[in-house]
């Protein structure tokens, strides 16, 4: 069982304990009302009072069950969705949509997860950029050693590095053309 499932289960248990506590308090109130009023009533009135109080208690129990179910399902569904999105990010899928309008703690977790995802995207981009820069340095060394056929890779994800490579390659091409003209 994952930590997220344990926590959502814990939340459900807390909600259930709260509902049971309210039901116990309502039962104690019903018993208190009945024990205070029943001695002064006739048998049929006592029966009607008991019937009415039991009906009220049942209505409270059903209402609590309904509210607990609705709140629990909504909360559990939100946590399960968030857990699924976190698993996608964990597996490397960084294009997961984490936009939310929630203002509760689940919304806070969504926003925190979005920050982590964005940070991972930047780290990946910087890693790729660092690789490209290292390749560019190697190519520059080759060119300085006389390899006029070396070129910088223009097909990279970073638009600024692609622009740099294109312009650098244009300069090399022009230099090569000028050298050919001078050699004639």
UniProtKB/Swiss-Prot annotation:
Q: Which UniProt keywords apply?
A: Membrane, Transducer, Transmembrane, Transmembrane helix
Which Gene3D superfamilies does the UniProt entry name for this protein?
Answer: 6.10.340.10
Q: One matching Pfam family, short form?
A: HAMP
Family membership, please give it.
Belongs to the methyl-accepting chemotaxis (MCP) protein family.
Where does it reside? Membrane
What membrane topology does the UniProt entry give?
Multi-pass membrane protein
| Highest taxon listed in the record's lineage | Archaea
State the protein's purpose: The HtrM-Xop2/SRM complex may interact with CheB or CheR and modulate their availability to Sop1 or Sop2.
Q: Which sequence ranges are marked TM in the entry?
A: 14-34, 52-72
| Oligomeric and partner information | Interacts with Xop2/SRM.
The biological process GO terms on file are: signal transduction
Q: Which gene encodes it?
A: htrM
Instruction: List the top taxonomic levels of the source.
Output: Archaea, Methanobacteriati, Methanobacteriota, Stenosarchaea group, Halobacteria
Q: Which SUPFAM superfamilies match?
A: HAMP domain-like
Q: Do the record's keywords include Metal-binding?
A: no
HAMP domain residues: 73-125
* Expression induction: Expressed constitutively throughout the growth phases, both in presence and absence of white light.
Q: Any keyword Transmembrane?
A: yes
The molecule here is called Probable sensory rhodopsin transducer
Output a single Gene Ontology CC term carried by this record: membrane
In its miscellaneous comment, the UniProt entry states: Is lacking a methyl-accepting transducer domain found in all other photosensory transducers.
Q: Which InterPro entries match?
A: HAMP_dom
User: What is the source species?
Assistant: Haloarcula marismortui (strain ATCC 43049 / DSM 3752 / JCM 8966 / VKM B-1809) (Halobacterium marismortui)
